[in-house]
Swiss-Prot record:
It comes from the Bacteria. Gene3D superfamilies: Ribosomal protein L31. One of its GO terms (cellular component) is ribosome. Part of the 50S ribosomal subunit. Zn(2+) binds at C16, C18, C37, C40. Coiled coil: none annotated. This is Large ribosomal subunit protein bL31. Signal peptide: none annotated. The keyword Heme does not apply. Keywords: Metal-binding, Ribonucleoprotein, Ribosomal protein, RNA-binding, rRNA-binding, Zinc.
Length: 74
């Protein structure tokens, strides 16, 4: 293998929105924050959970809503 071409791996802490934390190795050097992990994902828990995407849709509509309305009028 060639030397000096591979990124350095660091041990980072991954924090989920449910409060679960775990350590992993990554090329990132900062802690990582995620929305869903294996402790709270419906596939692993067997419980249904609604993931809030309304905030993203509202943000998109605020940003591009007027532009899309102008295109529809023309």
């Amino acid at each position: 293998m060639k030397e000096g071409i591979h990124p350095e791996y660091h041990e980072i802490t991954v924090t989920c929105s449910c409060g679960n934390e775990f350590k992993t190795r990554s090329v990132l050097s900062k802690p990582l924050h995620i929305e869903v992990c294996s402790s709270c994902h419906p596939f692993y828990t067997g419980k249904q959970k609604i993931v809030d995407t309304a905030g993203r849709v509202e943000k998109f509509n605020q940003k591009y809503g007027r532009h899309l309305q102008k295109q529809a009028q023309t």
